[in-house]
Every structure is written in structure tokens, then in C-alpha cells.
């Protein structure tokens, strides 16, 4: 009789908001999971770390809607593991701190299911760090207390409990207490805490949407209500709050709080998204284009078979690199096929895409446009035959300049781009109509063309509501041909150069 080998459950702390705060262990477990059960506050970027085969189940609890019960979630973990699946239970913050991780672990133990607890950065620690409010300081606080705003049944702790806490510790951190902040602050003052004690409320900690309000203890409830703050939020009380003005680093990042649309496929936007987060902004990744096979795959395979007969093979995009090497593999060849053929790339990102395939570019254009690449090839001399695997529709300047220089140039479509539709379009329209975007980043002419086609005749009107930023003058010219108003054009034609230009744009607008 065959028996199923039991699986295992990992209770993984997802961290508080910034997906970069996931632990290395947590990241590796997500990448190998069969099933992921995730909370409402889990950042979507973390789910992108999961393999395509992974089953993703949303078990988050949200206010105002019907939520899965804790018993149901626990039974799912047990059933999945007993059926032989490896399960990641992705929990916001740290699974052992006010996250019911201990309850789930006990249930797994009693059911005989193997489990592991993987710590995460708690929301308390993140709120403290990202708001610039340390929980302890040698001169101000040597003790700190974490407490939830309600008891097991969801009821407020008794006023006497808050009064006892008032002077028992120097820093008080209250989680999930916004619904009772008025009663909590009154009880702390009644218990002997000075009404002038500095206090703060930190909402959406470690995310670009983070908001922080500070005020004396007697006024913090009123101030947070006036600012419209609600859960998820942390209430902090103590003299350490006075250090915020000097230590607030996160909301001083150059693009803090802005929402930037990246109209590229998710698997190609991860590096761009991370660069955006480093500057304090929130990347919104929505594919405006889909990458598909060329109309004549046989022509691409034929070019791959004969690549050694060319003096140079020029790549103008990472997509072209990936598709060409797929064709190379289909005909039973690998990087050794390039023996005798030099390789050129239009820019550093394209050159970087070659490295995993075992190729280092012999030439990377100093200026990241086709004309510059053509000039540098022409300067080399002795180049007779050139192969260019590229998109079906692309600018003709590169092959035309090379042909004008006496070279034989074969242009082979390696892939085709087309506008993405369905849910991508609907989500994009919703964000634009509701004013949920600040900036739209165009990183190529094809993303401009595809996005305009996706939005239809109202494209110019819809896009007039956001700041349009283009990676270079060619992309900018494409946008202008569609009657789009471009606010930012990068001088350095890379994502980092584009974000630098965007920073300068906003800095000049406030100076």
C-alpha cells in the first residue's frame, strides 16, 4: 500500500511592508514552496518570488468583510502538509509577535505535522526604524513594552491595566490600538504619565504610504483623528519620540510617497521596482506589452544555426538576447556557437542579459541608442556581415547606417510585442481615473506605443493626469508623436538615469 510522504509547514515572517526586509531564509522558502497561505498585509512583491507552479491562497483578515476563521486556516495547513505538500504560511511582521503564530504551531504539533518558525522583522521594529523613533536610547529609555490595544476577545483592556502600565516602563508601543486611542491615552494620563510626554502614531510602517503624526500624549488622539489615521498603525509613547526630527530618514528619501507606474512585464520589472523602492517610492507594475514569438520562428532558428558566419551579432534588448538563446538551444547549440563572431550590446542592461548565457559583450555602446552603436561598429573596421536579432517592429536607423557603411546586415525578428489586455487594462484604467498614480515611466518606444494602443483614443487625456518620464530622447519623441506631454527626459539612458532625472524634476518644482 502506497503512503504519501508528509509535507512540512514553515511559518515565515513576511516583515512589515518593505519587501526588501524579508529574510534570506524566507525568500528561499518562498522560491521552493508548493503552496503559500498569505496574510492581507503581505506585500505582492513577495508573492512574485514564488515559483509559477506554486498555489497561492489569500487567507488574510480584512475589516468589514467576511474573513476566514483561524480554525479554518489551521485546518488548511494541516490538510495540505498531510497530503505531502510543502507549505509556507506567510505572516505579516514576525510570526511570534501578536501574529497567532504560536497557535498555529501548537495545532501543527498536536496534529503531528513537522513545522519550522522563521522569524521576520516585526511591524513594531520597522515602525520604530522607518519613522526615526528608536524604542530605546541610553539617555531617554532603557525599557520598552509591547502591548495590543485589545484582549483575546477583542475587548479593550481595563482602564486599571493601562494605568498600571503608565509609569511601569519608559517606552510604550501599542499595536492594533487605533480604535481605542482616546481611551488608552486618557488611562495612561490618569495612571500618572505626564500629558506632555511625546507620542506618535505610525501608519503603514515601512511602505511609501507611511504616515507619521506626533503630538503630546494629551493631544495625540485628536491629532491622529484629524490626520485620518487608522489601522494598521502603531502608537508610540515616550521621550524617544522627541528624536524623530533628527532621525527621520525614510520620509526624506527623494521620491518618498510617490507612486510610479512601470508598464513592463513583471519578470522584467523587478530590478526597476527595487530601484524605485530604494528612493522611497512605490512601484506599480502593470504589463502594457506582452512578449510573443516571432511570426517566423524558423528564420530565427536558421540565424542561430549560422551565427558563426557573422562578424558581429548585435543585441538591442534583453528580450532579443533571451529569445535568441532559446532558439540556439532549440537547434542544439550554446554559447560556443559564437566562436569567431563578436557580440555587441546597445547598453549595459542588454550586456548584463548576455552574462547568464555565458557571453560577455565585446562592445557596449557608450550612448545607448542604435545610431551610437552603428557609429562604433563602423569605427572598428573589417566588419562585413552583421546579424541583428530584435523585435518585429523596431527603429531602422541601426541597420540602415551599417548598410550605408558597406556592410551586409541581416535583421531577424526574435520576438513580437503586442498590447496586453484583460485585467491589465482594467487595473490601469482604474488607477488613472481615480488619480492613484503620480508618475509613468517609459523605458522604451515600444512601451509607449503599446500603452497608447491599450488605452485607445482617450490615451492622451488619461495620461495628462500623471507626470510622464522617458528614458531618453528617442522614447520621448515617440511619446510626443502620440501627443503626450513629456515632463522628464533622462540624460543617461538607464533606469537609474531616469530616476535621477525624476528626482531633479521634483527638486526644481519645490525650490
Model segments located where?
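Beta-strand/loop-alpha-helix module characteristic of Rossmann-like adenine-cofactor folds
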Residues: 2-11, 82, 87, 106, ...
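Short internal beta-strands
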Residues: 29-41, 198-203, 343-347, 467-472
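Short gly/pro/ser/thr-enriched loop/turn and capping motifs at secondary-structure boundaries
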Residues: 44-45, 63-65, 122-126, 143-146, ...
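Short, basic, glycine/proline-bearing loop/turn elements
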Residues: 5-16, 58-63, 145-150, 285-290, ...
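Signature of uroporphyrinogen-III synthase
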Residues: 17, 69-73, 79-83, 207-511
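Class I S-adenosyl-L-methionine
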Residues: 1-19, 24-121, 126, 226, ...
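Short, well-ordered beta-strand core segments
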Residues: 34-36, 56, 134, 172, ...
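A glycine- and small-aliphatic-rich helix-loop capping segment at beta-alpha/alpha-beta transitions
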Residues: 27, 103-115, 131-138, 329-334, ...
